Amino acid sequence: MASHWVGTWTATPAPADGVALSSPTIRMFPRISIGGDTMRIRLSNAAGTGDLVIAATHVAKRGAGAGVRPDTDRVVTFNGSGSVKIPAGAFVVSDPVSLTVRPLEDLAVSIHVPGEIPASFGVTGRYARQFNYLSPPGDFTGMEIMHASRVIDDWFFLSGIDVLAARDVGGIVALGDSITDGNISTHDAFCRWPDQLARRIVTRGGKMFGVMNQGLGGNRICHDIRGDSGVRRFDRDVLSQPGVTHAIVVLGVNDIRNRSGRKEEEVTADDLINGLNQMAMRARARGIKMFGGTITPFENETFMVGAWSPERDARRVAVNEWMRSAGAFHAVIDFDKFLRDPEHPARMLPIYDNGDHLHPGDVGYNRMGDVIDLSLFD
């Protein structure tokens, strides 16, 4: 059967503000969604202001702690070379790597970045909601047990892992903000709603889909913050993902909250509707089935005190009603309906609330993954 590349794991490239590095090996532990016998690694210098040199990259199956299983360790090359130079704003894709991996397996990707990288360079990263590791200066990419000088909560430079899959295997991209990224969920518990979606697809069996989490904390539809806005990054983070057949967009709450606090960045419901409609049309034009996720309630949130108001909530309600009725998306996933308090729809039901009244907790994130109708992907 013919095969093609499908994304099995992603991390949205964004600026890791204030991060400086001193010739470390970075060991990170992504959990993939689908398996395969051949993979490739994607590294990004999206936030960099100059060339980024990666001196060595290894991939293996995870061992204990910061370790790897040495029998699975593979050297990753780029056009036959163990090192690669990535221009500012660019990314690179590795040569194919022969390693058989199972769905939902934990991998270890180790990269060595030589020399001093000051904070002014612009390190590319994203919050991980799990423990990854930095070494003292030196190349420890091939070591089974890497001495860690620092525990980090980031993905540095690693932006994707693809597997070679049968032609009938599809890809689902989750485009969102911190609620998609699983902010404030338990570390190393894999409680993000895309994690739960991936588990359900694997458990169901049958037709398989890679699940690519392109959540980015603080992200908005209309304005940049901590990286590109939803409409700006849509081509890179959705349309260009290997094997993508379906996408779910869950954005808008940070626009309504005015996460930046700038008066000139206040938005109307129509602004958000226009942005969402653009994404839906662009996906359809590429043959991708696009699903809209309604905006969840956030009355009296404490993450950014004063961000909620009745007037802002009215915008949220208006956008959600448009999503449900306009037919712009192939289907709507009504996260608002499933998470809100039926007795008080402007707020999240306490069992799903992590306590800041904006982000779900582990139970809420798993609920989001559970309410997605898997028949949407048939």
Which residues are covered by each model-predicted region?
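Structural recognition of the beta-strand scaffold that forms the well-ordered cores
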Residues: G171-G176, T180, F209-G215, T245-V250, ...
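Catalytic nucleophile-elbow at a beta strand-turn-alpha helix junction centered on a G-D-S/GDSL motif
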Residues: V169-D195, G217-R220
